[in-house]
């Protein structure tokens, strides 16, 4: 377009007399013709100049969007980490004594076996033996109470529907008066801590009754 500009300003117009109507009209026509001929090119140059001005703004907007996306992802990751950490801490707190509690249950079992080994009527005939038995009973109850304060719960599911997640069936008891798989006898109580089974309840279940009567398993 620079060559055309030179043509427009060449010597043929340098001697124009603007006071002369003919020259003035000639110059006006030449100017209009020039603008009409090069209007598209002029608009293109203006558009390019505008684009050059707006490009940095668009780049900044794109960069801002990318940084915002990165920030949102970082916030989401931090929130997930916070929740996972809180869950891990809660689990560690709830289950930290699980192994210790399981060992204490064995002690409780031994205390109960000791009590069961005392012959019927022996305590009534021996004051010392009676006092000893009462002391053992108190010790066993205190131990279980201490475990319960730390989240350990006893399972004694007699009369409930057998649940393989919490119960272990050792034998069947023929009984047509109750639904199949109803716990008829508890040989050994079970224990849970939180949602984990420390020890399943050892049970005997009914066999021969009607089916399909749901009885939820729970702890006593």
From Swiss-Prot:
Predominant location: cytoplasm
Source organism superkingdom: Bacteria
Cysteines paired by S-S bonds: none
GO biological process: protein folding
Keyword Chaperone: yes
Subcellular location field: Cytoplasm
GO cellular component: cytoplasm
Pfam families the record matches: GrpE
HAMAP family to which the protein is assigned, alphabetical: GrpE
Family: Belongs to the GrpE family.
Matching NCBIfam families: PRK14140.1, PRK14141.1, PRK14150.1
Protein name per its UniProtKB record: Protein GrpE
Source organism of this protein record: Bartonella quintana (strain Toulouse)
Lineage: Bacteria, Pseudomonadati, Pseudomonadota, Alphaproteobacteria, Hyphomicrobiales
Gene name of the encoded protein: grpE
